[in-house]
């Protein structure tokens, strides 16, 4: 789609098992415009220690702020807004299926880092919008966080 329409300025990602508030997209776009960064309502500052990343440790050591950072990993459950130019052309490379087929947040982070873009929260603290209850059993969250699958993708 990006190849076909040069008028697209922003790409917003969302989960289909979350209920978003009315002005949700507006907050993302305004923050992205203000900082020239990828914006999110929820993200974690990556912790690197002993030669690898620890996603679960990162969750517990968030630096809550609204300052853009290369360390912030946006998590898509509450929505992410990307500037069109922040998405590296490799985002369409199908090799990601070999490394992170079910960890799209990590793949998008790698693509925006390689394009030189920081990430920023819309609000100082993470916001997790309400889940649609019928979707809980198959959520990627269950697999990626509770089964430590995100750690494996970050390595």
How would you name each of these model-derived features?
Residues 7-9, 36, 116:
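Residue-level detector of structured alpha->beta connecting loops
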Residues 8-19:
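Short beta-strand-to-loop acidic/aromatic patch adjacent to the donor-nucleotide binding site
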Residues 89, 93-155:
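C-terminal catalytic/acceptor-binding lobe
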Residues 2-5, 19-96:
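Conserved catalytic core of nucleotide-sugar-dependent glycosyltransferases
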Residues 10, 28-30, 118:
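Residues in and immediately flanking transmembrane alpha helices
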Residues 15, 43, 123:
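Glycine-rich, histidine-containing beta strand-loop boundary motifs that form or position
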Residues 1-9, 107-108:
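A conserved donor-nucleotide-binding helix/loop in the catalytic core
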